[in-house]
Amino acid sequence: MVETFSFAHLAYLVFESVLQVVIIALAGFWSASSGLLPKQSQKIISLLNVDLFTPCLIFSKLAKSLSMAKIFEIAIIPIFFGLTTGISFISGKIMSRILDLDKDETNFVVANSVFGNSNSLPVSLTLSLAYTLPNLTWDQIPNDNRDNVASRGILYLLIFQQIGQMLRWSWGYNKLMKWSGENTQHMPPSQVQSLLERTPNIDNEELVNEEQEEQELLEEENNRMNSSFLSSSSIGDKIWQKSCTVFERIRANLNPPLYSMIFAVVVAAIGPLQRELFMEDGFINNTFAEAVTQLGSVSIPLILVVLGSNLYPSAEVFPKTVHHSKLLIGSIIGRMILPSCFLLPIIAIAVKYINVSILDDPIFLVVGFLLTVSPPAIQLTQITQLNEFFEAEMADILFWGYAVLSLPVSIIVVSGAIYVLQWANPT
């Protein structure tokens, strides 16, 4: 049975959880402002967290509570990712059209709209809310508890995060957050110079490409004539090379958190190993499992400290473009406001009327609502720095998204999620 609470009471509970997260992030902001945590140290701590502490958190939470039945149920998450990405893309395009932005500015607003934070802030809030909010246990799981709720929330976020990260560093890095060269007005001098250096070579490259095409046609003709003499060993070599290429591409997209999730799935699939690690009060449980759990407990505070330190203004001043305010407004509305107008009703109706897979899990509803309104990903700062792409605008967007809007928006949205849960399950 779902216990009913007033909106004011729910808002107060959410406020407590969000404020806890904000206070830890403020510690990181203070550390950066006092010089205790300079940029280089932030990068080292962030790397240590991603490669060590976060994988331990993922393994300790998932391997303990996962089962094969749950693993099959999460197939809906890529569908949810596609839906949210599509609507966010449309939202970014709408804002760009309203604000009359050019191609590069439009790509920037679209990138900020599409690539929301699914790592630091949502993970911290989900863990905090899992132990604070009422009615988050799932009636389909016998003896469900808050530890299991937190574990499932992390699992949903992790899958969303991994898909988003691959998209950010492919489509985002190579297309959306890179100068097209169509309008050099906004481009920094170094990028303009690079564009000018590339331009004279275009005609030569076309001539070279034509010669290469002719050569390739001749080679193809020769290959056809000699195809009957192709040995089985050469076919085997080609298959082996193809397999190695595919394996390398897969390995390039793997990272420590993803490895950790894979190991957690393996442990969950082997019942005796899972019991020995987490349920039997034996040597392995009291040593290895406890050590991993303690390492994982460091992850969330470190994530928030680094998040807070990243929000401290850099000593380096980047020039603002002519449409600085337009880009700021378009990115914030396109990321945190406009998509929620479409997505939140869709999620609410799906939870009410489609009792399929994890749609019935209360923590999935909370995670879905949080992801819909989460600020732009901190990782976008790295991409804009690498491509020298609207760096001043990116810094201001992150400040407004995290320091100003995250607290009130999170309170309203999570309180709304619990209200939707009460509406969807009145008895």
From Swiss-Prot:
The chain crosses the membrane at residues 10-30, 43-63, 71-91, 253-273, 288-308, 327-347, 358-378, 397-417. GO terms for cellular component: endoplasmic reticulum; membrane. Pfam families: Mem_trans. Keywords: Membrane, Phosphoprotein, Transmembrane, Transmembrane helix, Transport. It is a multi-pass membrane protein. InterPro entries: Mem_transp_PIN-like. The modification Phosphothreonine is found at residue 199. It is found in: Membrane. GO terms for biological process: transmembrane transport. The modification Phosphoserine is found at residue 234. It comes from the Eukaryota. The keyword Transferase does not apply. Its main location: membrane. Present with 6440 molecules/cell in log phase SD medium. Belongs to the auxin efflux carrier (TC 2.A.69) family. PANTHER family: AUXIN EFFLUX TRANSPORTER FAMILY PROTEIN (EUROFUNG). This is Uncharacterized transporter YBR287W. It comes from Saccharomyces cerevisiae (strain ATCC 204508 / S288c).
